[in-house]
Amino acid sequence: MDHLPIFCQLRDRDCLIVGGGDVAERKARLLLEAGARLTVNALTFIPQFTVWANEGMLTLVEGPFDETLLDSCWLAIAATDDDTVNQRVSDAAESRRIFCNVVDAPKAASFIMPSIIDRSPLMVAVSSGGTSPVLARLLREKLESLLPQHLGQVARYAGQLRARVKKQFATMGERRRFWEKFFVNDRLAQSLANADEKAVNATTERLFSEPLDHRGEVVLVGAGPGDAGLLTLKGLQQIQQADIVVYDRLVSDDIMNLVRRDADRVFVGKRAGYHCVPQEEINQILLREAQKGKRVVRLKGGDPFIFGRGGEELETLCHAGIPFSVVPGITAASGCSAYSGIPLTHRDYAQSVRLVTGHLKTGGELDWENLAAEKQTLVFYMGLNQAATIQEKLIAFGMQADMPVALVENGTSVKQRVVHGVLTQLGELAQQVESPALIIVGRVVGLRDKLNWFSNY
């Protein structure tokens, strides 16, 4: 270990920055946020320093580096564009045993500045020891996506409850189980973020009053249309907190690779060599695992409330009194159309969009007359086996035979394939495509030749 990571208490302590440019301004902002009593020494200053000085936030000393400014300092930063000056600052600080950071010169510095994720009072610092700042920044960005913005509020509130928790729960094990429940409670986190004091108090009292081995909960998460980059941040957070993930065939392997490693996984979809698990059995799996006290994530392709039968699954949980929440996902219609260069609406061609299931309950029938109307886009989910019928019905109810159509197979993934033609070819085109696939019908499909961007990657 080349550097010891420490967190410095600088509030109301003297610190010095030498330099008055953009880099110095970024360092000054950090020290001011930490509450330092800051002096900045430079030949010239960018305007932001004057603003801060006029507001009484720092002291400016205009002129060459004056090493006597270090005499009362706890910490210094050399941030000029002159290597000689920076080295003088470093040497002067070293002789006084003052920690000094030298921007872009880690070997000349006695401490380095990490990339910071600020969820005060929770702080995360990432450093490559000065060898690869870009790598540290990229890692910080990944960690940023995993840590909700309101996490600091949750941590601060936890501090207020520590004495009560210690008083109510006698053993370390009981306290640990309480805090585990506390920190994964989405209702509490959202209430804190919304400054809803009534909801915060109600949720807190519920956490304290319920048994530590109480029933678990189910989170219905939309995984998006395929590309793992389209999974929402909240969806990612949920699958990394899950005890068990119940998933279907439309969830890509890339997304499943993001699931917490020690979480149990239950596959309930149809693939080669597997039989589709009946919906009622899926409902019972969710119910059974939640009743064991587990945090269950039901992971579905697309959005769980758009032809995902999410409502049916939640009704079962509701009847049993199991807590649940929903994380929306990007639905296939939106993702597949965007990755195919097909805008679902356009002022010249489509003023509305209809999302239609091609898989009806026995005896069901679609409203073909309205579906055949002009100036709209139709998106059929699960319609591949009914493509010939869709073609026949739309033409019979008045849709023009030359209406453009597209079928998107494995949309948004590296395996995406798009075939397109006109309505009279729909049944034939469907024979060239394998599930999962989406059918798009409308004049907007004609824009694909100009707007298709994904195939160029």
From Swiss-Prot:
Residues annotated as binding S-adenosyl-L-methionine: 225, 301-303, 306, 331-332, 382, 411
Pathway entry: Cofactor biosynthesis; adenosylcobalamin biosynthesis; precorrin-2 from uroporphyrinogen III: step 1/1; Cofactor biosynthesis; adenosylcobalamin biosynthesis; sirohydrochlorin from precorrin-2: step 1/1; Porphyrin-containing compound metabolism; siroheme biosynthesis; precorrin-2 from uroporphyrinogen III: step 1/1; Porphyrin-containing compound metabolism; siroheme biosynthesis; siroheme from sirohydrochlorin: step 1/1
Family matches, as HAMAP family: Siroheme_synth
Source species: Salmonella paratyphi B (strain ATCC BAA-1250 / SPB7)
Protein name: Siroheme synthase
Function comment: Then it catalyzes the NAD-dependent ring dehydrogenation of precorrin-2 to yield sirohydrochlorin. Finally, it catalyzes the ferrochelation of sirohydrochlorin to yield siroheme.
Region (Precorrin-2 dehydrogenase /sirohydrochlorin ferrochelatase): 1-204
Active site (UniProt): 248 (proton acceptor), 270 (proton donor)
The keyword NAD is assigned to this record: yes
Homology family: In the N-terminal section; belongs to the precorrin-2 dehydrogenase / sirohydrochlorin ferrochelatase family.
Keyword Methyltransferase attached: yes
Catalytic activity: uroporphyrinogen III + 2 S-adenosyl-L-methionine = precorrin-2 + 2 S-adenosyl-L-homocysteine + H(+); precorrin-2 + NAD(+) = sirohydrochlorin + NADH + 2 H(+); siroheme + 2 H(+) = sirohydrochlorin + Fe(2+)
